[in-house]
A protein has these predicted regions:
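Short, charged helix-capping/linker segments at alpha-helix termini
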Residues: 13-23, 33-53, 176
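Short helix-capping/turn signature of helix-turn-helix
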Residues: 27-30, 38-40, 133-140
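Residues within the DNA-recognition helix of helix-turn-helix
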Residues: 28, 159-162, 166
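Structural recognition of an alpha-helix C-terminal capping motif at a helix-to-coil junction
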Residues: 49-56, 69-81
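Arg/Lys-rich amphipathic alpha helix in sigma70-family domain 2
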Residues: 60-67, 77-97, 162
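Helix-turn-helix DNA-binding module
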Residues: 119-130, 138-155
Length: 183
């Protein structure tokens, strides 16, 4: 029977068990990397670097994990903070708010209007994107997203609502073209 996250954390804290921490990394690296890739607008190398920093910080700060939330929620919080710190350090990656972008819903490719979810997510503000990805892709509750992003619950709900509304507007033309092509 596999150990729970709580059991593995206890083993790491009791005897600095590297194998136990390695198992925590194996369990959580894919969702953390996917979240960071979405936040980094698809830059896999940046996502990998930030994920590595996330797990290094988790190793160093594991003693601060209180168990009030799931381990994955705590880990996503570290990942989001790593991303936010990176953006602060590298102003050229500062993300524009989708409201400041042109109203063109998609780009033409091979004569067809297309906009996939990845491209649409890039057009959301970083706060909207983080809230939508954590809630819809990673399955966190609004309360957990509030903890991860360290913002009020109402702000999370607003960011999710606005993000979903923008995604609907951005993806509607692509979906109509997909449907009219007989798919």
């Amino acid at each position: 029977m596999p150990f729970s996250d709580a059991d593995l954390i206890a083993r790491v804290l009791a005897r600095e068990d590297h194998n136990a921490f390695g198992e925590l990394v194996r369990r959580h690296q894919s969702p953390v990397r996917a979240f960071l890739a979405r936040m980094a607008r698809g830059d896999a190398h940046l996502a990998d670097d930030l994920a590595q920093e996330t797990f290094l910080k988790a190793w160093k700060k594991l003693h601060t994990f209180r168990g009030n939330a799931r381990f994955s929620t705590w880990l996503f919080g570290i990942a989001f903070n790593e991303f936010r710190d990176f953006v602060r350090r590298r102003k050229e990656l500062a993300l524009e708010d989708a409201d400041n972008l042109p109203n063109e819903p998609a780009t033409a490719r091979d004569g067809l209007l297309r906009l996939d979810l990845t491209e649409a997510l890039k057009r959301l503000s970083s706060n909207e994107r983080a809230a939508v990805v954590l809630c819809c892709q990673n399955g966190l509750s609004h309360e957990e997203v509030s903890q991860v992003l360290d913002c009020p619950l109402g702000t999370v709900k607003t960011n999710i609502l606005r993000g979903k509304d923008k995604l609907r507007r951005l993806l509607a033309p692509a979906y109509k073209n997909y449907e009219s092509a007989g798919n």
